[in-house]
């Protein structure tokens, strides 16, 4: 039976206004819209009055429900029938954890009530199309239609293909019907194999073969034999990549054979809880570094949010499934798309060439895709710390003559680093009889065909198969699985995981054969043991679907009880679905039909399938010389600063958590003005050291339109000039991921790909001492469509994205582009040696040209000398700032440095030649260093020692003020105010934020950037930062116990425990399942801290599901109430823990006036480094800090204080319960965005109880308790930041 319950309003006023404006623009006469959430409960038994009241209360969250009956025509938007939304999975979990077992499933829709003039049926269809994502949702005309969401079908049997009766044609028909993308020789191979077996194949076997042997999974082109211009080539592409490892194997521990590569890290104290006692402590051991970079291009073109989200999620799983289990740590994200054409903000170079109906626009991708990628990283609890963004779409004269080149099929890049124990780098042995396990969520009918679909050019497959390729993300489930993996690797030698892979393309049909085959075994499986939420699925759908957040593992049978215990504690679902066998054979039994859908020798599936041969021709690009007749430097500056590739990326940065883990030493945002210009990302290796890891990206794809090899060399060079900003040492410590995107089969592209791989794998990397131990390829970067009567194609440039990874010697020595105005000198290191080529530059692009001669690596020895010189200068602390030269050239390098330093620049470019346009806008390798004036001679001498004398040019200096002046021989070349340039540079991010977020907030942020008087972040302390007030108490040896409380989806508990540990506490890991299961009580604890994260993925209100699981469980409710009433206890709630505790007001004495925390005013997750002041309040944790003003990490989507009315706010203030407020950089309490990131009244961001024993706050002091973890800080701070005082206050209060 289904029950319908109304929910809160679904859209803020500005979202409704945006919808109305879209309808008006489409000439749809819609006058008013009201939208509210509607909940549908699928019940297996009726609820009594108490249970009904509980369910009703559970579904009350967010803004207050409208009391009026909505008017207008109803359009109900729900998930597509036959799918289960991530919201549904999490909400159902909450209901069950609150004891409502009668609820089989909760689902949510949005009821739109539309008041409109008379509309035709077609116009109503247009209205409906604006309200939903056709790939994921459907529209019903009535609420009761939602019953279709809960219809269960009978299981479907396996289907056989009559190969023996119909011959080869049966396979050809199945290939088309199932979208298998099989090549002719593969059809021949299958015909021969099954004829030998003497039986017909089942559809599931063909599908499994197609996924396991797709280009996406098997990388056939990279393993192919090559004939170029009639000459056989000596090596495959992959062999040339492997040559880098054969030449420079140094520091590599694992390459080419696992889900990620591994290199040597540093010996540090890894901080985690003991399995038996729950007590956190440091464990001194090597923290080796793993690295992986994936792409998820096809799904992102079809449905950007889930496409990008599952792209990030899949890469995170690759990291976790490395060796015998590892820990993902920090991420990177990148996008290449066609021109944005922002409505009302179209740029002169952005022609509309049309697109296929089935893919979304570049603007849609960049609106939704980054949000999806960020949301997954945020909810999983991994900071995303670097990235890139390129737009390109133009008709150019390239290798194949004049044609359309661009990214209608986008690049969505997802990568990152992690850590792994030394003894877990290599996978173990799968013993015969080992249990074969699926860890993670249930099978669902989603993502079918992802591997094969990704291997086709967009436009080749059937639209229904595109629907089938759309995936669904549930990062909170993946976090639970990762917690299980963490518990396993933390057991060291007792780790129960023998072997692990992630489930990606092809689902279990790819993952399980790969698992047993890699382990040298076979497998015997039972289909019906696979967890499934949809009983009507066929065997093919159960075995081959790509439900996300799953891993496959081999666990020894005697270790199963331990594994079961770990999974239950973390509430991570798992199923034992088979056993490892001696014989390398794969069998899948189906209990329901008592038949055998799969019965194959593994070598048929994964054996010597036909090897590809690429017989291709070389084409040379001619290009056209740049026509510069109408180009002025002033206009060029304006245009280039508006090119999205160059322009400010704040709209892509602040949506992503950049502080979780407490180990982020360098994020994108630089300096007191938080400008997103960092060259690389840096993390600390642990919470007790200054060793670390660095990541950077290099990518110069448009150059490939003129010179394939040069483009590849520049990508490597740019990654190197970016990562050189931190202290690494030996260049051999740097390891690269190479991600290759090409339109294989397009004239000239295959030979160009070979040239590019050879240039990097056989030449440049070996010469530099660089290794490429990991990478990925995507070989179908083309879209086809009909535009009127014309057949069109959009082909991407050959695109190599290089991600560089390295161990860092001392993270404190990382340089940024932030200029200093002390007596200084700016020096250009020009690795282009005066070539100043303008082909395929940003300058050429904004004037709709390509040019003829591009930049290149001019001298490999000098590139190596540059890196070595930078390392010497970084180690000697001789540099004040560094920024590489890349898109936009020297002009942009200097401008971004001035933006970061909020200062002026006076430079002279006479030494760079007479062609000022080329000097300022060429994109040759190199960059600008800033040195102290007195160090200039010594620095130039050192650069000369490294062979760079002819590359170094003195430019001028940074000055206080607002003028950005470029001269040549004292003649002005360009002069403008830095503020004007900053505003131009920011306009793209402003317009994107206006479109995507609350436009009022976007306007306020843009206005703030234009304020030259802004002093930037600053610090005022009312206490001595160097005083350790906890030291006398630590000296007694007594360590009070703090319960570090987490719920499923939590993610800030480790750094929280470390902060309390440093202050003299014994931090104990306490999961809510421990309390609900009665394994642990709160009676033995002196302090309680509820940590941040996304409990239940913020479903049913941030923190509210967590709170209600306490309030609706009588025994646990009593535990908390007793704790809060006990004298001599302390409690802290941070972020998600703050939201949770604010919903426990009925249990906490003196908290009656506390507010609720609701959706940010921007309607967006906000990750900021915000200035707060400590106000006078009873809070025991903030004693002695009153009046202090300092920045703190902020990461939340629902942090806005909501009070009932003005009287409630006045009472909260008059009682003095406000503990922290947001202030602007002038020290004034603010409600203005982004200084106040959520719009809370009076800047309120922390409150306390009347006795001060319980304090709750939205910002994260635990993430910045170490100075090194602050995005910016005064140079005189030591190891501890001022926020460490909170934790020491806690220790002092407990005596």
Curated annotation (Swiss-Prot):
GO molecular function: ATP binding; metal ion binding; phosphoribosylformylglycinamidine synthase activity
Active-site residues, record numbering mapped to chain: 1135 (nucleophile), 1260, 1262
Known catalytic reactions: N(2)-formyl-N(1)-(5-phospho-beta-D-ribosyl)glycinamide + L-glutamine + ATP + H2O = 2-formamido-N(1)-(5-O-phospho-beta-D-ribosyl)acetamidine + L-glutamate + ADP + phosphate + H(+)
Keywords: ATP-binding, Cytoplasm, Glutamine amidotransferase, Ligase, Magnesium, Metal-binding, Nucleotide-binding, Purine biosynthesis
Stretches for region Disordered: 305-327
Start and end residues of each Glutamine amidotransferase type-1 domain: 1041-1295
The enzyme's E.C. designation: 6.3.5.3
GO biological process per UniProt: 'de novo' IMP biosynthetic process
UniProt-annotated binding residues for Mg(2+): 679, 718, 722, 884
Database matches in CDD domains: GATase1_FGAR_AT (cd01740), PurL (cd02193), PurL_repeat1 (cd02203)
InterPro entries in the cross-refs: Class_I_gatase-like, FGAR-AT_N, FGAR-AT_PurM_N-like, PurL_large, PurL_linker, PurM-like_C_dom, PurM-like_C_sf, PurM-like_N_sf
Compartment(s): Cytoplasm
Pathway noted in the entry: Purine metabolism; IMP biosynthesis via de novo pathway; 5-amino-1-(5-phospho-D-ribosyl)imidazole from N(2)-formyl-N(1)-(5-phospho-D-ribosyl)glycinamide: step 1/2
Binding locations of ATP: 307-318, 386-388, 678, 886
PROSITE patterns per UniProt: GATASE_TYPE_1 (PS51273)
Gene Ontology CC terms, in alphabetical order: cytoplasm
Listed Gene3D superfamilies: 3.40.50.880, Phosphoribosylformylglycinamidine synthase, linker domain, PurM-like C-terminal domain, PurM-like, N-terminal domain
Domain of life: Bacteria
Self-association state and partner proteins as the record states: Monomer.
Function text: Phosphoribosylformylglycinamidine synthase involved in the purines biosynthetic pathway. Catalyzes the ATP-dependent conversion of formylglycinamide ribonucleotide (FGAR) and glutamine to yield formylglycinamidine ribonucleotide (FGAM) and glutamate.
Protein's recorded name: Phosphoribosylformylglycinamidine synthase
Species of origin: Salmonella choleraesuis (strain SC-B67)
Source species taxonomy: Bacteria, Pseudomonadati, Pseudomonadota, Gammaproteobacteria, Enterobacterales
